[in-house]
Design a protein with these regions (language model features):
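N-terminal accessory/capping or targeting/presequence segment of soluble
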Residues: 2-104, 118, 122-183
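Short, basic, low-complexity termini and linkers enriched in Ser/Thr/Gly/Pro
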Residues: 103-113
Length: 183
């Protein structure tokens, strides 16, 4: 599938689920700096291969927020995709929640107000913060993974590496002690 076909498929699924916008962060469930290919959902939906970015797809727009380190790369990789670059390092660039609320207020009131995210890609605090900010602007955050049902062909598997234990001399605390603290 091309980027345009992926965006069309995502929008069709969004309509089916009653979703107005979908946020696709360039992260994994562990907030890892170096993530496994399986979790490169933002790259898959936009074509942008940079290490930092977040995509927002609405029923009629597609945008990518990234910082100044990736502007040139993003411009080149987004060419021909209909994905608009949002230069988040620029002083006048709105945050994603600000953009969503403003865009909703400026003419899409007749559409649904649901904003979907895959909750696995957010920390608990990050999710709560986003939910609260969107609610204040009249939008509803919903937990729906909209990418996995679409990215079925050629998606790399989740790695199955063995676990290993860091010795206490490196961590400063035993496994037993850590487990006791969380129980």
């Amino acid at each position: 599938m091309t980027i345009l076909q992926r965006l069309a498929a995502l929008r069709a699924l969004m309509k089916e689920k009653g979703v107005w916008a979908c946020i696709v962060p360039g992260t994994d469930p562990h907030a890892s700096e170096y993530m496994a290919e399986h979790w490169t959902e933002m790259s898959w939906i936009t074509g942008f291969l940079g290490e930092t970015g977040t995509a927002v797809i609405t029923l009629d727009q597609a945008l990518l927020w990234t910082d100044s380190r990736y502007y040139l790369q993003a411009e080149a990789e987004l060419k021909g995709t209909t994905v608009e670059l949002m230069r988040e390092s620029d002083i006048d660039c709105p945050s994603i929640p600000e953009w969503l609320v403003t865009t909703q207020e400026q003419g899409t009131k007749n559409q649904d107000t649901k904003v979907a995210v895959n909750p696995e890609m957010y920390s608990v605090n990050g999710y709560r913060e986003l939910k609260e900010t969107l609610q204040e602007g009249g939008l509803e955050l919903v937990s729906i993974d909209l990418i996995s049902p679409l990215w079925t062909e050629g998606r790399p598997a989740i790695p199955t590496s063995l676990l290993y234990e860091y010795e206490e001399k490196y961590t400063g605390e035993s496994v037993e002690s850590k487990l006791q603290r969380v129980r």
